[in-house]
């Protein structure tokens, strides 16, 4: 609940602040969102986004959005983690990295309950990979191993060798980046922004006739 911080910001900048608390059981909205998005879409923040647009439409017909700020100005925590991992990658030759971090990533326990500083499984797995592959692994919900355990032989065969990594590969083909951090920013510009964030706000706002 960030409402108290929103109120503080509004007071600092002396803006007209409106606050509205919605019920957590907003399941009745899901069917409506399915119609608005008209495609498979799994970002749960579409629900509060729609509610914000709905509330804004009561006061205005056009609004400015702050979306893409984190992508443009390296605001996500995952960017900082990637930069840290990249510094470690440069310390070890690729062969040594794979030999050291692959077994660590495989056998180190997944400690979701533990303090962040001793959770290392995903980091070890990332360090065993090259930059783009490591970033894809870090932002993916389903790992390659999980997909293999879930897909039947028929499903695997129907994919005809396709791997979601190809999306990244296609965007990076022929591109060169002096800084790997710029590379993952570019990937987010090409995938995460148009495929999730911008789509979320665009469809939700159109659903209430709000121009964002």
Where in the sequence are the language-model features?
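Structural motif
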Residues: 42, 175-188
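A short, charged helix-loop
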Residues: 162-173
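ATP-dependent adenylate-handling active sites, centered on carboxylate activation for C-N bond formation
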Residues: 1-162, 200-212
